[in-house]
From Swiss-Prot:
InterPro entries the UniProt entry points to: Aldolase_TIM, OxRdtase_FMN_N, Oye-like
Membrane-spanning ranges: none
PANTHER family, per the entry: 12-OXOPHYTODIENOATE REDUCTASE 10-RELATED, NADH OXIDOREDUCTASE-RELATED
Binding positions (substrate): H242, A243, A244, N245, R334
Gene Ontology process terms (BP): fatty acid biosynthetic process; oxylipin biosynthetic process
Chain positions recorded as FMN binding sites: P25, V26, S27, A58, Q177, R294, G379, R380
UniProt KW keywords: Fatty acid biosynthesis, Fatty acid metabolism, Flavoprotein, FMN, Lipid biosynthesis, Lipid metabolism, NADP, Oxidoreductase, Oxylipin biosynthesis
Pfam families per UniProt: Oxidored_FMN
Described purpose of this protein according to its UniProt entry: Putative oxophytodienoate reductase that may be involved in the biosynthesis or metabolism of oxylipin signaling molecules.
Protein name per UniProt: Putative 12-oxophytodienoate reductase 9
Enzyme class: oxidoreductase
Length: 412
């Protein structure tokens, strides 16, 4: 490729990036029992290149953040009461897994072991007992937020460490996205700013969500603080606060979802309060120069229409600038109301801190986006092809269909 801005160095705060292609967080729900697994090490190490920035998949700030009920979250198990596959870890340091050789590469047998591990996991979801043998397709269940990784206890910190070390060994920088699910997943009692879910139930929320009390909101903010602290203990270079895609912080922003009449509802400032509090707490805990924030103000995920998305975004960007947050990760909307298409720009729009944009599927399109000085993120491309950065260098990226599937080391 001729001289491209995508491959030019970029200084982001105290971080020196070799190029402007960032590995976006992609939820995979393969961390059985919320414990990072051996295949996570291989997955991220494959995608790490010198001077690159990777952002790990959304990691829950608490057991309740997975979408569990308040009572269950208080003393709930870290994993479901079903047998785990051989090699999956519950409170065991990942370095004990004998298929990892030097923490970065794996032998051919090790790769196959990891692939078999993942295959076992998916097969175990085909029946109710959790046994891979004799699975019946009729009992298939979709990946669950319960299988998202977490960052709320010491065991998870220890499980993340070798994964972070593997990424650092490749010369890359590694952030972790921290997240609270809210009402999105199908669970017993998801939490929400509101009382009901549009007056009925559907496949997204089979039970009525539980309204959060003020004290519980304060605790959630504290959970974000602790998760950020734990991420640094695990070796991450920073965290990204997930305030997008219809999850809890995003739910508070949307007037169609947030019907509260207290200090967390009503005005734009009130609806953004929990997000602002979380940003402030995390910045205070680990330093604002280690904090990014993900927003999707125009997206209407999970029936969460917004009447004032631009006002919400501008308010939050102003707060980020005041705190000195490292970057703002804005997602290109794929779910949006028709009237928001081509929405006019605010005449005095404040510039977001170090803008990062996700949802730019082709490197030529991304090249146009990063010329003003931001970075482009690619999550889905890297999910399928860990070498996407190397492909751009010669200017001959493979077509989207040419990806490695069964058999190769990329299948994790």
């Amino acid at each position: 490729m001729e001289d491209t801005h995508l491959l030019t160095p970029y200084k982001m705060g105290q971080l020196n990036l070799a190029h402007r292609i960032v590995h976006a967080p992609v939820s995979r729900f393969r961390s059985y029992g919320s414990m990072p697994q051996p295949h996570n090490l291989l997955y991220y190490a494959q995608r790490a290149t010198p001077g690159a920035l990777l952002i790990a998949e959304a990691s829950a700030v608490s057991y309740a953040a997975l979408g569990r009920s308040k009572d269950d979250a208080a003393n709930g198990p870290i994993h479901r009461q079903r047998p785990g596959p051989p090699g999956f870890l519950f409170g065991t340091n990942l370095t004990d897994y004998n298929s990892a050789t030097d923490g970065v590469k794996a032998t051919e047998s090790g790769v196959n072991d990891r692939n078999n591990l993942s295959k076992w996991w998916f097969m175990s979801r085909l029946n109710e007992s959790g046994n891979a043998g004799g699975a019946e397709e009729s009992h298939y269940t979709l990946p669950s937020s319960l299988d998202a990784p977490g960052l709320w206890n010491q065991e998870q910190i220890e499980a993340w460490r070798p994964i972070v070390d593997a990424v650092h060994a490749k010369g890359a920088l590694f952030f972790c996205q921290i997240w609270h699910n809210g009402r999105v997943f199908s669970t017993d009692n998801p939490v929400t700013p509101q009382v009901s879910y549009f007056g009925n139930t559907d496949d997204l929320a089979p039970a009525a969500p539980q309204r959060l009390e003020t004290g519980e909101i304060v605790q959630i903010v504290e959970d974000f603080r602790v998760a950020a602290r734990n991420a640094i203990k695990a070796g991450f270079d920073g965290v990204e606060i997930h305030a997008a895609n219809g999850h809890l912080l995003h739910q508070f922003m949307k007037a169609s979802v947030n019907d509260r009449t207290d200090e967390y509802g009503g005005s734009v400032e009130n609806r953004c309060r929990i997000t602002v509090d979380a940003m402030s707490a995390v910045a205070e805990e680990i330093g604002a120069d280690r904090v990014g924030v993900r927003l999707s103000p125009f997206a209407d995920h999970c029936r969460e229409e917004g009447t004032d998305p631009e006002e919400v975004a501008l308010h939050l960007i102003g707060v980020m600038n005041g705190l000195g947050v490292l970057y703002c990760h804005v997602i290109e909307p794929r779910c949006m109301r028709e009237q928001h298409r081509g929405a006019p720009r605010a005449p005095q729009r404040p510039a977001p801190p170090a803008p990062v944009q996700k949802g730019v599927p082709r490197h030529v399109h991304c090249e146009r986006r990063v010329r003003p000085g931001g970075r482009g993120q690619g999550g889905r491309r890297r999910l399928r092809r860990p070498g996407v950065v190397r492909e751009i260098v010669p200017g001959q990226p493979r077509p989207a269909g040419e990806v490695q599937a069964e058999g190769g080391s990329e299948r994790v």
